[in-house]
Every structure is written in C-alpha cells, then in structure tokens.
C-alpha cells in the first residue's frame, strides 16, 4: 500500500495504542503519528506529534506566536526550524513534565505486564457478565482488548451506566466518539 500512496499523507491517531503496545512509526510507514497524553495517564491538554522531517519542514504551522518565528517583516514571515516551528507561545510546561512522568511510569510497569493484568480483569469481567440473566456479552470468546461490550435486555444503556456508577463500577455509555459506526450497528 505504501508504494501506491503517491501524494497522500497518512496520519495515525495513536491515542488508543500508546498505553497498550509498543509503537514503531518506521514499521507503520505513516507520515504523522499523534497521541493525546491523557490516554497514557498524563494530564489533559498535552500530547505528541511525530512526523517525517521532510513533511514537517513543508507543512505550515496552524498557530502563530513566540518561538516559532525566525523572522517577520511586512513582506514575509520565516518560520523557525522544527520542532520550534510548531511551538507557538508559552509551552504547556506542566503538561510536558506530566507526560514525561506518565511515560516513565508506564515504561516502569512494562506494557506486557499491563496487558497481562488487563487480560486477567477482562476475563473475569466477561465470565461474570456471561452469568447474568438478560445480559448478552458481545463476542465473549473472541480475543480483544479490555473493552467489553454488552447488551442489556429491557434497560436503556444510560440507565444501566448510571446504576453501575452508583455501585462504584466505571463504565462508558454513548457513542464513544464514533457515532456513524454506532448508528450503523
């Protein structure tokens, strides 16, 4: 597929992957790879963008300010070298420190250990949910991430989510940022 891309720029949103698997952008063959830090247990408002140097040098910044400018005249603006070209204004220093700490934390735990623990919890949840009447676990025997989807007969998903929350069980209901898919299902 890489050979047939021509001028297409491939951006991968890796927010869901970074806390669960090692990511090799060279192996993926993407042009840009982004993730938000809160998916890696960092504070909100921080993330990372990796990009191929030649692409980052060509792309214009989307914001203006501070360190990103090398020269400004009435006739032209010359942007700073990367990465400063994309660093408009005062950086989110606290967020960057938090992201670095989160990366150290996850690295210290080890992605394999995290995956094994998630799998153990997922298996326990699936077995417990399968035993509940009027509850259907979708694809219970298919290997998957720690996300477990269920259908509850006769109960609206928001009501079920509220009841579980009152019992101290964290769940997510709604469209999960993919409303077209949910509508199709």
Language-model region placement:
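Pyridoxal 5′-phosphate
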Residues: 1-185
